[in-house]
Amino acid sequence: MASTYKARQFNLSNLKGISDETLEMHFKLYEGYVKETNKLNEKIAEFIQNGRVDQEEFAEYSELNRRLGFEYNGMVLHEYYFDNLKTGGGTGDPTGRTGFRQAAEESFGSYDIWKADFVGIGKMRGVGWAICYEDPSKGKLSNHWITLHETGNVAGYDPILVMDVWEHAFILDYKPADRPKYIEAFFSNIDWSAVERRLHRRTAQQIAA
């Protein structure tokens, strides 16, 4: 039986530097990933159920399977992205001795060094994502560029902060060459409590283990 997913609803509006029009367009694009993921899961399930995986249709099955990684990751990464934004805008950089700031200091030497690295990755040429991951076995943070949605994901690492840097995330508000301005706007809208929950959830799981 094929797995089915429902598009989530996100209560986001009045962000700083990211228009509601951009958000509405982005939500619709996300819903498209959900629909395509469901379609692919259904088609793949039919191939398996009918025993057609090793037959002459194998090339088609292979392409469906490869495509699933693109659509599914596109769906999930957008959910992480929307979840780490705060309606009405955030407060900028985290203040005080937060769990994330402490993790950034332990992993990079300081929060500012971590941020400079993350922003630098977000400015890289290409289409994809900048993601801060936590290594669950070490508790260390690291920043990575993900091409499209799936190439470069670090197996076993947990996404803690996810930034979409596809042009669709900002093209209505900024020119392609102005991606740094979008990144600045992104940081002014981060919901650090959501980021903390991701980090603390992993920490709690490690302690419980």
Regions found by a protein language model. Name each.
Residues M1-A209:
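Feature for soluble, non-membrane regions of globular proteins
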